[in-house]
Amino acid sequence: FLAPHAIVASNTSGLSITRLSEALPDAIKPRFCGIHFFNPPRYMTLVELINTPTTEPKVLDDLEAFVTSALGKGVIRAHDTPNFIANRVGIAGMLAIIKQTEAFGLTYDVVDDLTGKKLGRASSGTFRTADVVGLDTMAHVVKTLQDNLGPDKTPDPFSDMYGTPPVLAKLLESKNLGQKTGAGFYKKVGRDIMRLDPETMEYVAGGAKANEVVGRMLKKPAGERLKLLREAEGAEARFLWA
């Protein structure tokens, strides 16, 4: 039983809300929308609201009012495009970082140090964040982009970037899915955090930090910081500039 005023919503992080609505009775379609909370929802402020062509505007208005006033969240309204806004941008960034990590021969722990608090982001950086999210989940998000974007699909100038990185494919094949399975880009052994060596697919001692010189660069005002990174020759600085 569903009350005639009840709102039906999906928490999908990127599947088409319009396509999901096609399985619903016509009477429910006007009350159906997407409401994407970010994990862990207890702490993450952002919520995406996504309508379909048949969603009544009042449904989104009422949901936004409730989510902001009762739950204290910050709402953005997203179009019904693959992975909406945050995951579309976020996964593109992660894939670019994986590619540049390989190109500059950097290790995952160093890159996490560079892309974490030093850039004003979460201390987990890139690869630790991927482990927490789940590498299988990450792969599903990537596949949503692969299935829906491209020259013969929805145009996206960055669609060539959405290939599955070989290291991710190998981790998925070995069932090392991140934190949920105890191993991914990192693996905890006793009290030690080991990091993956992508060449051997074995875990080695981790905990390396970025070069102190690069760390000092990132503390400079924005203009000076960019100038220093542009002129620097080290792999870590070139990685950040890339």
Task: State each model region's role.
Residues 1-242:
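N-terminal glycine-rich phosphate-binding loop for ADP-containing cofactors
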